[in-house]
Amino acid sequence: VYPHSDIDALFDAAQQAMPGWAQASVRERIGVLMQVVDVLYREHLFELAHAVMHTAGQSFNMAYAGSGVNALDRAIEALVYAEQAQNAVTPSARWERQFGASQIMLDKTYRLVPRGVAVCFACASFPTWNAWPSMMASLATGNPVIVKPHPATILPMAISVRVFRQVIAAAGFDPNLVTMALDTMQDPIGKVLVQHPKTAIVDFTGSVAFGQWVERNAYPALAFTETAGCNTVVLESTDDLEAALRSLATTMCMFSAQMC
């Protein structure tokens, strides 16, 4: 049985953890998060693969790849993009302009300001696939994260959150930069999290219906959604019907029919 936290307390803790993290340099934040990647890979990868197997129902190979090494690839990619975006902002600039006989000169300084608390929804089928890069992107840019796993796949995200918190604390920062909000299918809290007044970012992966609700109701929070996809196939002609049918069957059934 997992503990259930008070939602307002989670947001308060996240906000209190943010100032020290925001004051750290981009390089320092990225370094801490790369350490998270290293610990997940070296110490927890097989544990996480089995956790996904026994919650999402995937084969070991699929869990190891889709919710393991490939998800870590995506986490690192998010860190790269976050570093590039932040380093593209110059720390200072001098502006000069002539107004008649007067020369106006301004020395400008710029600083990166986090948006605020991010809420990350992890999906039921591939819990870490989008959650890890989402968490990394928010944290790398100075934002604390509240993780909301799907009730069916809490274990892999609980392991992940524990690792994030341990590494962040070991680096001297407040571990409440990463927390977890749990619910059940009978008593969901997703809408409460999305519409909480302290929510600044919503990153949702899951059903089309709730994803559309998030897109309509997340404002003024910044919202990102990835929902299920289903593509139609028009078979115009083929010179090998058996091979074509085999390919279509593989497409429909691959990844235990869980991949979007």
Language model region names:
Residues V145-K148, D203, F224-T225, V234:
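Short hydrophobic alpha-helical runs that function as membrane-insertion/retention elements
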Residues R29, G142, V178, V202:
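Residue-level signal for inorganic ion chemistry
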Residues V163-G172, A209-C260:
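ALDH superfamily catalytic-core signature
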Residues V1-Q103, A137:
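N-terminal Rossmann-like NAD(P)+-binding subdomain of aldehyde/semialdehyde dehydrogenases
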Residues D107-K108, T179-A200:
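A structured beta-alpha segment of the ubiquitous adenosine-cofactor-binding alpha/beta core
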Residues P127, T184-P188, A209-F210, N231:
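Short acidic loop-to-helix transition motifs that present clustered carboxylates
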Residues W132-M136, G190, G211:
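Generic hydrophobic/aromatic pocket-lining and core-packing "Φ" positions
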Residues Q84-A171, A228:
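Conserved small-residue-rich beta-alpha loop and adjacent elements
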